[in-house]
UniProtKB/Swiss-Prot annotation:
The gene coding this protein: ugpB
Signal peptide: 1-23
Role played: Part of the ABC transporter complex UgpBAEC involved in sn-glycerol-3-phosphate (G3P) import. Binds G3P.
Protein name, UniProt field: sn-glycerol-3-phosphate-binding periplasmic protein UgpB
Listed InterPro entries: Bact_solute-bd_prot1, SBP, SBP_1_CS
């Protein structure tokens, strides 16, 4: 009987110790990467998990950027937030003002892991840095700039030089007419119209998007993208639209699919769209810089980043935060950051990742792969071309989409639409300013 008891006790202790040995800290990571990008996120997580058996990063696709941000905030309010939330760049002010985050530099400090914030490319890191402390609040992950993708085969058919994409918007308008005359149904389409046609158009041409240096200097900023230069640009696109040379295909990244399917000869889209274009395009394509306005003195200036960063959510235990810190450290290692850059088309987020990519000969073997980086570093940023930090910016983008759509459908003139977008957007800015002071 005693022997049986000892055996049972020994078995129980053995199972208990086995359970402790097998205890794994699960770390949910909500993101918006789909297609080839999602596969690469899964690959990074799997490799981290294999090297760190005490932790399990669980990537979960939660829809597009807006949907993921909304889901993350809603989950935080009910106590069910993920440990890591990917948030697009225009959600930065919203996340900073929320009580939902644990600053990334604190996560590393508490975990006892050395975190060199200077390793990140300054233009990228500046977007996510707290002006008061000078520390990173979130970790840059998939940063991008808009680039021009063009169908070299279609260029040849239209009698255009396949190695010379249009450099200015005026040239692009001429090219689209020739491409359409040569039989292309769609000469040009644009993804993310607010980000590319107003936010980046403004920065690339050395124009402010909003006062207070685009909101970096205070929450009392007002929108300023209804000035003559921006109105003229939207008018050019509307003129192309009436001729059938510019096709509006959606608010997000729909134009990328239209491009790699061969429907559209050119598109401006995120540099991060390269992964899907590389996978699905069945023709020769090239990558060029964003066009600039030939009539604006000093253009082009510098591009501002899009994409997203990784935010750490409040309310987790110490072991979870230690695992998060290890995973973020893993992502920033030169070999991993360089691979992410090379496979996706997103910018190298660290200087070491850029240098490693260059040393590996990647840019020599893949002409155009460094376009996004060169645009970002084209000229030292002006105070109002280093990015945007405006409250309620996701909602302002929706307003911009609505008003631009009223231009493409002929309901409003470019001036009317941009004036209305500025007025409606400023109401949201005042609401955010009031809430941030309460």
């Amino acid at each position: 009987m005693i022997s049986l008891r000892h055996t049972a006790l020994g078995l129980a202790l053995s199972l208990a110790f086995t359970g402790q040995a097998l205890a794994v800290t699960t770390i949910p990571f909500w993101h918006s990467m789909e297609g080839e990008l999602g596969k690469e996120v899964d690959s990074l997580a799997q490799r981290f998990n294999q090297a760190n058996p005490d932790y399990k990063i669980v990537p979960v696709y939660k829809g597009n950027y807006e949907q993921n941000l909304s889901a993350g905030i809603a989950a935080f309010r009910t106590g069910n937030a993920p440990a890591i939330l990917q948030v697009y760049e225009v959600g930065t002010a919203t996340m900073m003002a929320s009580k939902a985050i644990k600053p990334v530099y604190e996560v590393f400090k508490d975990a006892g892991i050395n975190f060199d914030e200077s390793q990140f490319v300054p233009t990228v890191a500046g977007y996510y840095t707290d002006a008061k402390s000078g520390h990173l609040l979130s970790q840059p992950f998939n940063s991008s700039t808009p680039v021009l993708y063009y169908n070299k085969d279609a260029f040849k058919k239209a009698g255009l030089d396949p190695e010379q994409p249009p450099k200015t918007w005026q040239e692009l308008a001429d090219y689209t007419a020739k491409l359409r005359a040569a039989g292309m149904k769609c000469g040009y389409a644009s993804g993310w119209q607010g980000w590319i046609q107003l936010e980046n158009f403004s920065a690339w041409n050395g124009l402010p998007f909003a006062s207070k240096n685009n909101g970096f200097d205070g929450t009392d900023a007002v929108l300023e993208f209804n000035k003559p230069e921006q109105v003229k640009h939207i008018a050019l696109l509307e003129e192309m639209n009436k001729k059938g040379d510019f096709s509006y295909v959606g608010r997000k990244d729909e134009s990328t699919e239209k491009f790699y399917n061969g429907d559209c000869a050119m598109t401006t889209a995120s540099s991060g769209s390269l992964a899907n274009i590389r996978q699905y395009a069945k023709f020769n394509y090239g990558v060029g810089m964003m066009p600039y306005d030939a009539d604006i003195k000093g253009a082009p200036q510098n591009a501002i980043i899009g994409g997203a960063s990784l935010w750490v959510m409040q309310g987790k235990d110490k072991e979870t935060y230690t695992g998060v810190a290890k995973f973020l450290d893993f992502l920033a290692k030169p070999e991993n950051a360089a691979e992410w850059h090379q496979k996706t088309g997103y910018l190298p987020i660290t200087t070491a990742a850029y240098e490693l990519t260059r040393e590996q000969g990647y840019y020599d073997k893949n002409p155009g792969a460094d376009i996004a980086t060169r645009q970002m570093l084209n000229k030292p940023p002006l105070p109002f071309t280093k990015g945007l930090r405006l409250g309620n910016m996701p909602q302002i983008r929706t307003i911009v989409d609505e008003e631009l759509e009223s231009v493409w459908t002929g309901k409003k003139t470019p001036q009317q639409a941009l004036d209305t977008a500025v007025d409606r957007g400023n109401q949201l800015l005042r609401r955010f300013e009031k809430a941030s002071k309460s």
